Amino acid sequence: MNPYFYELAKISANKAAENGIIVDPKWIYAQWHVETGGFTSNLQATHHNLGGIYSSSGSWMYFNDFPEFADYFGRYLTYYSEDGMAHTSSLYDYVAALHTGGYFSADISTYYNALLSIVNTIPF
């Protein structure tokens, strides 16, 4: 586990909570870990974009630094409120809301299991 990125996930979870979305920072961390290939992607390095987030123009969103991304991502999760994000109580609910909202189109079980394998490595 990367403590720096886990702290950022906590920032995102807190920002989401300010907007009525309650998610475990472990879920966010796991999502970012999967999306960045273990925090090694070029997009992460060049755009501080841990989630593969696109702008409305269809290009990758650029963030000045990782804390800016973490703040944005917490607010971004509110876009999935109607897809079930407002009522998540488990990792599966979180993944299902993202899938329903179109965040990813891969098989839901595959994505869920990828995140679960990361969550299970977090020692607390």
Task: Write out the residue ranges for each language-model feature.
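Catalytic cores of secreted/periplasmic lytic hydrolases that degrade extracellular macromolecules
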Residues: 1-124
